[in-house]
């Protein structure tokens, strides 16, 4: 069968955006697409739940409210910090930052409310851009 999974970011700890409301509306939109293409294309409803461990109650509400076919777990920032994309890595001890990042990833895995883990080396792409180094 031909199929597609439609997912979108939901960085649950976002300060400037109501991701709960967005997730509900996005799920409803995908459900309409599922119905429209039923019998022709398998459409899966998914979500990339970023930083789910930082707002577990909100995350659990989203996952309980919507019957996702696939949930991607990810960490785009450390708790109470900006996304790794925005950091000036010259101001950080990289080893310490990565240790904290992988500890957060470990907590995410222990939480386990997802089907697959996204981009495990996410900060490394931005560290490389700043420092020219790519090492673990």
Range-by-range predicted roles:
Residues 65, 111-114:
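Alpha-helix termination/capping residues and helix-transition junctions
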Residues 104-108:
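Internal active-site segments that recognize and position negatively charged phosphoryl groups
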Residues 114-136:
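Histidine/lysine/aspartate-rich catalytic loop segments that bind and position anionic ligands
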Residues 1-99, 103:
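A metal-dependent hydrolase metal-coordination microenvironment
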């Amino acid at each position: 069968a031909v199929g597609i999974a439609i997912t979108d970011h939901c960085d649950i700890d976002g300060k400037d955006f109501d991701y709960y409301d967005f997730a509900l509306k996005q799920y409803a939109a995908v459900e309409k697409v599922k119905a429209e293409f039923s019998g022709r294309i398998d459409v899966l409803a998914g979500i990339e739940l970023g930083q789910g461990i930082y707002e577990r109650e909100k995350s659990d509400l989203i996952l309980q409210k919507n019957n996702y076919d696939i949930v991607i777990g990810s960490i785009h920032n450390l708790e109470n910090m900006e996304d790794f994309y925005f950091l000036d890595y010259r101001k950080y001890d990289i080893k310490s930052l990565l240790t904290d990042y992988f500890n957060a990833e470990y907590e995410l895995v222990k939480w386990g409310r997802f089907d697959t883990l996204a981009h495990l080396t996410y900060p490394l792409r931005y560290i490389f851009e700043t420092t020219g180094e790519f090492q673990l």
